[in-house]
Swiss-Prot record:
InterPro entries per the UniProt record, alphabetical: Anaer_NO_rdtase_flvorubredoxin, Flavodoxin/NO_synth, Flavoprotein-like_sf, Metallo-B-lactamas, ODP_dom, RibonucZ/Hydroxyglut_hydro, Rubredoxin-like_dom, Rubredoxin-O_OxRdtase
GO-annotated molecular function: electron transfer activity; FMN binding; iron ion binding; nitric oxide reductase activity
Classification via PANTHER family: ANAEROBIC NITRIC OXIDE REDUCTASE FLAVORUBREDOXIN
Binding positions for Fe cation 1 per the UniProt entry: 79, 81, 147, 166
Locations listed in the record: Cytoplasm
SUPFAM superfamilies per record: Flavoproteins, Metallo-hydrolase/oxidoreductase, Rubredoxin-like
Major location (coarse): cytoplasm
The organism of origin for this protein: Salmonella paratyphi B (strain ATCC BAA-1250 / SPB7)
Protein name, per record: Anaerobic nitric oxide reductase flavorubredoxin
Amino acid sequence: MSILVKNNIHWVGQRDWEVRDFHGTEYKTLRGSSYNSYLIREEKNVLIDTVDHKFSREFVQNLRSEIDLADIDYIIINHAEEDHAGALTELMAQIPDTPIYCTANAIDSINGHHHHPEWNFKVVKTGDTLDIGNGKQLIFVETPMLHWPDSMMTYMTGDAVLFSNDAFGQHYCDERLFNDEVDQTELFEQCQRYYANILTPFSRLVTPKITEILGFNLPVDMIATSHGVVWRDNPTQIVELYLKWAADYQEDRITIFYDTMSNNTRMMADAIAQGINEVDPNVAVKIFNVARSDKNEILTNVFRSKGVLVGTSTMNNVMMPKIAGLVEEMTGLRFRNKRASAFGSHGWSGGAVDRLSTRLQDAGFEMSLSLKAKWRPDLDALELCRQHGRDIARQWALAPLPETTQKTAPVEETTTCAAADLGPKMQCSVCQWIYDPALGEPLQDVAPGTPWSDVPDNFLCPECSLGKDVFDVLATEAK
């Protein structure tokens, strides 16, 4: 199957609706992906890239239905990774003498994967051209570390199509090929997710490389990526987004993520978020439990944020393993222009929060004070968490904050009456977790100030996941 891209250019790639893991299990491809290969038929026939190795046989069979393989004059490999050049061994078994145009670094990568040094490699550099007839040329532009040392782009004159490799792509599978045909919200979510999780470490290279390409003063009518859609409607919009994302990008957003053993650190996270919102109701605050959340969504939110609060319980005097792993990933992604603070609960000995603070600083974050709580935070400790959130909101504000009206403390009789109206605290008879009506349970959409009688029947204990029927009135409040 092929799809007409423009004039004598056809898409001959492979859709992968089922793929959910990429780069091992490091990247969750929740909307599948595609491996884009392009066949150009001018006076010379050119194949740009292949597909993932698991589709090698299918790819060659489909390609044979489009063209006699012996009629392919040139193969262009923009990138040697297996999702781009994976079908080379299957293809070259049929046409072993066909020249392969790629960078010098790509030869090393291709031989490292396919082990065929005898293939007919042709090394190209930035500015080199290849005449393909009918007055058209291919112009090559090296793009090292976007995102491998071997990467390059290929520009086709006449049709003004930039074959951009991984840049401007997204792991997004759709039967429709072009950017103006697909759901725009989904598309741009996946574009940002792709940039945040794959290209962020190389942001310092993005702007000068785009500037270099624009310096050729070549028109760009289409951008044909290696994954996802082909940009035919206003293709420069994605280029402009890349320039924006590469420039120490941040939004007025704070990301909080944590891991917890006994729910204590989660309670801290909720209270910190409440404090932030009290002082700055306009800032977007997102909370994630790393054990239950999509890691790449967390990292995308960190990319978007001006700051991040990371929480961990102490286990064996160190931070929780999932937190340690995610902080290591953030170190590799080399986020810039971001602030951070560590927090967490511990028992008889701490250690995790201090260790976490050091690791966040090593990862390049500008650090704010950390916060610790011993055992399960009581009302006083939770108020300290809220105050920490208030302080963070003020310290990390991007613009003057709205003035808050000082609340007058109610008389004691009113406070007692209000507290009584909420009813008693409830304790899980299995794990001893306590439901406090004053705090509610935000992760289950139970707002602070919700009496137990108004808690939905489908409520589950956050600790042991059992229902309301296992709860009793807290013994100290029973009459």
